[in-house]
């Protein structure tokens, strides 16, 4: 019975892309290789990052959200987020046979049918926009398709699950952020938010 279930799962994988919602490779590249793609080459096994092209393919990954995480206390969150997005864009150029940036659902399907991994960008923490709807819109134009509202700390507009509540959920500006994300078609990721924010 287990073999039959595995066969069904594999058949499903061939028809529908498995999309991994979070991969910290861009952060690992920043922290361990000074953003140098040659130092953590994805065509070779990467035991420290647990991510390489062979493993992604073997795991049946058809779509990958690359997390563009920056620390909540980063003094220049917009710049740091742009640098992380730049890493993802450079990955697409370095490995065009494996990855392509996907901006729409149709892109995901097309890339998957070509046997490549549809690559999407997820922002981990609303602090990345530095309380700017303009920054949010520009990140979307660069390919960000979800944003986690918080990470380990509150922002000026939303409470995190692991910080002392100051807003009891979303502020009026926080509601504007969510409305703008909905208008843009960005997923609102509730990981790390306080219960009141939900």
What are these regions (language model features)?
Residues 1-168:
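N-terminal hydrophobic targeting/anchoring segments and the immediately downstream early-domain regions
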Residues 92-93, 166-185:
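Alpha-helix-loop-beta-strand connector modules within alpha/beta enzyme cores
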Residues 135, 173-177, 197:
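Short, hydrophobic/aromatic alpha-helical segments in well-folded domains
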Residues 153, 193-194:
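A generic "binding-loop/recognition-motif" signal
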